[in-house]
Amino acid sequence: MIAGFDFSVAKPACCLVTMDAAAGVSYDFICWPQDIKKSAAAKYAGCGVSCYSRNLEPVSHVAEGSTETVKAHIRRAMALADIINGWLSSRKNDGDLLYVASEGLSFGSKGDAVTNLATYKGVFLAGLMRIGLADDLFTYSPTTMKSVAGCAGKAFRSLKDPMIERFGQNGPSEHPFTWAVRNRRLIAKTAWIDCVDDLCDAYWVTRTCYIKEKDMSGFPEIPDFEKEIII
């Protein structure tokens, strides 16, 4: 099993690939937004994506002050880690190997938002290691992921959502989420609904892990991941 995470404070997402000798390869797409519109949640339910709203208001630094803000984020980070680790535990059977991959922070990132992200992600990964759920952990730079997706370099900087577009062209061929993205069924007015970018990035994290680690880790072949990237 490979679980690729696009980890964020507001709307973390995961693409879990399970390789079974008898059942073949299966994909789970799941996200845990702080909050999401009912119309968006309904669209996800219609294309095989599990979307669990945490029903949280944003933490207000002004209203709570620095100390209370830090404590609020730590409590939320711990609660989120418990939710995600509980879900991973429910998907992992005895004898399964679980590899967890995530995207690293971009070079030059700074500010409170990045500090909070590092806190949430650190609490999550520490929890994985503490309970021994993951057999190995991997982290990849944003540039590495973009290279795997075929959209690295200056030529793609002007494009609005290259990782989403690449997913629509190259995502798992039998999954309804791929079809929904390819046919632009998850757009509200002129923009993608919340979490589409996170779910697509999570897929590219998973695919990056497979490509980079398959020789060393002995992953079973995943046909969709072996295909040439359509550009």
Language-model features, listed with the residues they occupy:
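Phosphate- and other anionic-substrate recognition elements at nucleic-acid/protein interfaces
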Residues: 1-231
